[in-house]
C-alpha cells in the first residue's frame, strides 16, 4: 500500500493551540469549538479510515459570516483548514491534519428553496444527498447523482468531490447537476459562481 505524503507539521501552530481555540471561540459560539481529545476523536478520520490523525480543533460554524471570519483569521495566522461535510468520502478530501482546523459544515443543513417551475433546489452544504430527494419526491423528482453513501453524504461534499452514482451514466455527476455555488475563499471572501 502506498503511504500518503502529508504536509510537514507546523510546531508553532501546535504550540499556539490554546490561543487559537480562544480566538475561534470568539468567532462562533464556544460550544461550536471542539478542542478536547474526547471531542476530537470522532473527527480523526473520514471514511478513508486507514489514515487517522487528531485535528488541532474542530469548528462547527452556523452561518456564512462565521465561516468567513474563521477563514479570515486562519488565513492571517497561516493556520491550515480542512473543510468537512459528512466525512463519508473515500478519496481523502477531508483527512484531518494535526496542525489544522477541521471546519465541519454539518450545521448548514437546511433546504432554503425548492423551485419546481425551474427544476432547482437551493440548499446549504450540510443537507444530505438523499435529503434533497426526500424533499422533492412527492412531486416526482429526485436528485440524480446518487453515490452509495447518499443516506449520509452531504451536498457540500458531493460538490467538493464531484460525486456521482448509478444514475450518473444518464444524468451526469454533481457538476452536471448544479447551477451555482456560494463559497467562502480561504481569505474569508464570499463568492458566488
Regions found by a protein language model. Name each.
Residues 79-80, 142:
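Residue-level detector of anion-binding/catalytic polar loops
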Residues 1-72, 89-119, 134, 148, ...:
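N-terminal flexible segment immediately upstream of the FAD-binding catalytic core
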Residues 82-84:
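Conserved PLP-anchoring active-site segment centered on the Schiff-base-forming lysine
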Residues 110-193:
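FAD-binding subdomain of flavoenzyme oxidoreductases
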